[in-house]
Curated annotation (Swiss-Prot):
Its main location: endoplasmic reticulum. It is found in: Endoplasmic reticulum membrane. Belongs to the band 7/mec-2 family. This is Erlin-1. Residues 321-348 are annotated as: Disordered. The gene is ERLIN1. Residues 1-7 are cytoplasmic. GO terms for biological process: cholesterol metabolic process; ERAD pathway; negative regulation of cholesterol biosynthetic process; negative regulation of fatty acid biosynthetic process; SREBP signaling pathway. The keyword Transferase does not apply. It comes from Pongo abelii (Sumatran orangutan). The modification N6-acetyllysine is found at K269.
Length: 348
């Protein structure tokens, strides 16, 4: 064997080794697990992220995602209970496969498990829902419930068929309906919108009227309260004036009563003092003093009796008639007072 043949052989061996190494070395991305098939049989040991070596041309692998992924189901037909065929353009199913369930699910449903467990189930559940409801319910009334109903139905079946596969969310686009029906629905929605606008305007008008009524009531209540306060103020002023008048009257009455009591007490004391003071002897003394201070001389038979007592007057009358002597005796004139005797003597 010459050198040329040896070089060709070495090059062929190196190329074969390189091809074998290239075919045996593979890379697994983060968030994925690799499952291996050897001769068509699934191996029990999945591999995690990184570089791995396998027997080329004998062992094959499939990468299975274990993080959140979104599967899309497109153009799903759906027949309503009224016989109208509608199409849902796209349904998105967000799901996640747990790493511990990878081997069982791949063994039971292959690495394309989402086609069996999600796509087919979506078609079945959606047709069940549409066939039980009318177009009005599917398109308008119950459309907001389709997402949640599909999610619950899928998760319920997966809990039995494929534990470890979890449905996180389901998003359904608006169904496509026949053009004529769509226009009718649009007109109906437009009329409903107008009705809602009219109802809202009516509510606004009613609210404004209610607001005005409340404002009027509040204003009336305010006026009434102000009037009530003013009335109470006037009543209090009148009551205060009445109270002041009563106090003044009571004070005046007390003063007058005290004054009357004082006058009564003074009069009573004065009467009592006079009672004790005006004795017959004192009166007699005062009479004599009054006669003594009187400088008038009376002549004739009409001498007032107040200046002489009865016995003196009788004696004086007898003297004037001549029954007695022309000059009265000293004893007869003695009660009349000393001044009267002196006056008589001066005129005789």
């Amino acid at each position: 064997m010459n050198m040329t043949q040896a070089r060709v052989l070495v090059a062929a061996v190196v190329g074969l080794v390189a091809v074998l190494l290239y075919a045996s070395i593979h890379k697994i991305e983060e968030g994925h697990l690799a499952v291996y098939y050897r001769g068509g049989a699934l191996l029990t040991s999945p591999s995690g992220p990184g570089y791995h070596i396998m027997l080329p041309f004998i062992t094959t692998f499939r990468s299975v995602q274990t993080t959140l992924q979104t599967d899309e189901v497109k153009n799903v037909p759906c027949g309503t209970s009224g016989g109208v065929m509608i199409y849902i353009d796209r349904i998105e199913v967000v799901n996640m496969l747990a790493p511990y369930a990878v081997f069982d699910i791949v063994r039971n449903y292959t690495a394309d498990y989402d086609k069996t467990l999600i796509f087919n189930k979506i078609h079945h559940e959606l047709n069940q829902f549409c066939s039980a409801h009318t177009l009005q319910e599917v398109y308008i009334e119950l459309f907001d419930q389709i997402d949640e109903n599909l999610k619950q139905a899928l998760q319920k079946d997966l809990n039995l068929m494929a534990p470890g596969l979890t449905i996180q969310a389901v998003r359904v686009t608006k169904p496509k309906i026949p053009e004529a029906i769509r226009r009718n629905f649009e007109l109906m929605e437009a009329e409903k919108t107008k009705l809602l606008i009219a109802a809202q305007k009516q509510k606004v008008v009613e609210k404004e009227a209610e607001t005005e009524r409340k404002k009027a009531v509040i204003e009336a209540e305010k006026i009434a309260q102000v009037a009530k306060i003013r009335f109470q103020q006037k009543v209090m002023e009148k009551e205060t004036e009445k109270r002041i008048s009563e106090i003044e009257d009571a004070a005046f009455l007390a003063r007058e009563k005290a004054k009357a009591d004082a006058e009564y007490y003074a009069a009573h004391k004065y009467a009592t003092s006079n009672k004790h003071k005006l004795t017959p002897e004192y009166l007699e003394l005062k009479k004599y003093q009054a006669i003594a201070s009187n400088s008038k001389i009376y002549f004739g038979s009409n001498i007032p009796n107040m200046f002489v007592d009865s016995s003196c007057a009788l004696k004086y009358s007898d003297i004037r008639t001549g029954r007695e002597s022309s000059h009265p005796s000293k004893e007869a004139l003695e009660p009349s007072g000393e001044n009267l005797i002196q006056n008589k003597e001066s005129t005789g």
